[in-house]
């Protein structure tokens, strides 16, 4: 018979639960009652087999959003001539993986084909074209989408309506009419208004609340508000500010979702910036966790290799939780800890270190001490209950406490 020393047993007790408790982002999100954790994708990167392998990892991603292939220019490039080829590729991938499809988007001032932006419209003719577009696209994807972003970015920064072709020609009524049309085409899909810079209190968030009330006043269905959440490292709203803002929306009787999360930084990245990014991701996801009617989080692609940020914001990037080489960044563990999961064993940060033991007895005995991010308590837990210097054993749920 082989006898193990007390030190060895203590080490096993610390490390083994770390391994068994480890979980991916979607697994952790669903475990605490969220509907999903997901990511956007786009067709060009679907030729990258290593990328698709991780995209299809349902432990991390339970939902996919097509970044561009369901927008107006992609689906109706010529009037009443519809093409769904690229959108179907993403939809079929999600279906094959058992992932939810969050569909995006139906009415937006951007990425419109020339026949829309340059048309000579009246209220009646543009309404007919808009309703025809919505009806055809939603009908094609009926039963495949968990939710649709029906109207996207209808507001200026001061909360007034954006002067789009739809607002110029139809007025604010185009918004509730779009929602009514989408609901008629697929009565079961969830319908969202989606925008950026509405993640914190201010004129634009107030404008988005006005849109919710407008849609409701027309008797139209609106299920939720999408908070895009394109943030900047070090300037991300606090957890409390985001949670308070979410509460202002849910008080109107709708859900919220974080729909396009990324947190960019000025390049090159540094350890300090990556650490702050981890904190910012944590606070954002924690706000959703704190909010019962925040149904889930979608990141705006998962790897820096295919992020939209560098081509849009000069000198900025590194906005995603995985780097260009598909390695997890500290941000990943920031997200996972906010969701109540244990730290990643493969993160490029030091946060995934397993628990160790430290001898504190002059007689040769040992006391287990969990390192940063290690488990330190929970129902049935028999391992270390003390944390390394500088960290506190923090309650996460009845089954899990963590050194934070």
UniProtKB/Swiss-Prot annotation:
InterPro entries: CBD_sf, Cellulose-bd_dom_fun, GH10, GH10_AS, GH10_dom, Glycoside_hydrolase_SF. GO terms for cellular component: extracellular region. Divalent cations such as Ca(2+), Zn(2+), Mg(2+), Cu(2+), Co(2+), or Ni(2+) at a high concentration (5 mM) slightly decrease the catalytic activity. Fe(3+) shows strong repression. EDTA and SDS also inhibit the activity. It catalyses: Endohydrolysis of (1->4)-beta-D-xylosidic linkages in xylans. It holds the Pfam family Glyco_hydro_10. Residues 26-338 form the GH10 domain. Thermotolerant xylanases have many advantages in industrial applications including higher specific activity (lower cost of enzyme), increment of substrate and product solubility, and decrement of microbial contamination. XYN1 provides a potential way for industrial preparations of feruloylated oligosaccharides (FOs) or xylo-oligosaccharides (XOS) from biomass. Synergistic reactions with other polysaccharadide degrading enzymes such as lytic polysaccharide monooxygenases (LPMOs) are important for industrial applications. Optimum temperature is 75 degrees Celsius. Coiled coil: none annotated. GO terms for biological process: xylan catabolic process. The active site is at residues 153, 260. Pathway: Glycan degradation; xylan degradation. Keywords: Carbohydrate metabolism, Glycoprotein, Glycosidase, Hydrolase, Polysaccharide degradation, Secreted, Signal, Xylan degradation. Residues 1-22 form the signal peptide. It is an enzyme of class 3 (hydrolase). Residues 368-404 form the CBM1 domain. Optimum pH is 5.5. Its EC number is 3.2.1.8. Glycans are attached at residue 123. It is found in: Secreted. Endo-1,4-beta-xylanase involved in the hydrolysis of xylan, a major structural heterogeneous polysaccharide found in plant biomass representing the second most abundant polysaccharide in the biosphere, after cellulose. Efficiently hydrolyzes different xylans including beechwood xylan, birchwood xylan, or oat spelt xylanand; as well as xylo-oligosaccharides (XOS) except xylobiose. The main hydrolytic product is xylobiose, followed by xylotriose and unidentified longer XOS. A small amount of xylose appears with extended hydrolysis time. Belongs to the glycosyl hydrolase 10 (cellulase F) family. The CBM domain in xylanases is involved in the binding ability of enzymes to natural substrates and enzymatic thermostability. This is Endo-1,4-beta-xylanase 1. It comes from Penicillium parvum (Eupenicillium parvum). The lineage of its organism: Eukaryota, Fungi, Dikarya, Ascomycota, Pezizomycotina.
């Amino acid at each position: 018979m082989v006898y193990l020393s007390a030190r060895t047993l203590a080490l096993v007790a610390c490390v083994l639960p770390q391994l068994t408790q480890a979980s991916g982002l979607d697994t952790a999100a669903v475990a605490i009652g969220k509907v999903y954790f997901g990511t956007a994708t786009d067709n060009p990167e679907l030729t990258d087999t290593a990328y698709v392998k991780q995209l299809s990892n349902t432990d991390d991603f339970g939902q996919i959003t097509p970044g561009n292939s369901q927008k107006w220019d992609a689906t109706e490039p010529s009037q009443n001539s519809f093409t769904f080829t690229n959108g179907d590729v993403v939809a079929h991938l999600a279906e094959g993986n058992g992932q939810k499809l969050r569909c995006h988007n139906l009415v937006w001032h951007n990425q419109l084909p020339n026949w829309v932006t340059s048309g000579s419209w009246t209220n009646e003719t543009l309404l007919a074209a808009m309703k025809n577009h919505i009806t055809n696209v939603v009908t094609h994807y009926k039963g495949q989408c968990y939710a649709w972003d029906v109207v996207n970015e209808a507001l200026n920064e001061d909360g007034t309506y954006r002067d789009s072709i739809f607002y110029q020609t139809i007025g604010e009524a185009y918004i509730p009419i779009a929602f009514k049309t989408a609901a008629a085409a697929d009565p079961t899909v969830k319908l969202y208004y989606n925008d950026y810079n509405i993640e914190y209190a201010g004129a634009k968030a107030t404008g988005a609340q006005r849109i919710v009330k407008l849609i409701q006043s027309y008797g139209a269905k609106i299920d939720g508000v999408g908070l895009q959440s394109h943030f900047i490292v070090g300037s991300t709203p606090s957890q409390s500010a985001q949670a308070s803002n979410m509460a202002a929306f849910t008080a109107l009787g709708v859900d919220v979702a974080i729909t396009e999360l990324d947190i960019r930084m000025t390049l090159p990245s540094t350890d300090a910036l990556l650490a702050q990014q981890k904190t910012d991701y944590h606070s954002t996801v924690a706000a959703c966790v704190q909010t019962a009617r925040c149904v889930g989080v979608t990141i705006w692609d998962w790897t820096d290799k295919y992020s939209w940020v560098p081509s849009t914001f000069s000198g900025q990037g590194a906005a995603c939780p995985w780097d260009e080489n598909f390695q997890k960044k500290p941000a990943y563990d920031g997200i996972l800890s906010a969701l109540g999961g244990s730290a990643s064993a493969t993160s490029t940060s030091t946060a995934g270190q397993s628990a160790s033991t430290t001898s504190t007895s002059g007689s040769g005995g040992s006391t287990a001490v969990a390192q940063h991010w290690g488990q330190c308590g929970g129902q049935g837990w028999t391992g270390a209950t003390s944390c390394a210097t500088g960290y506190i054993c923090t309650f996460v749920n009845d089954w899990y406490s963590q050194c934070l």
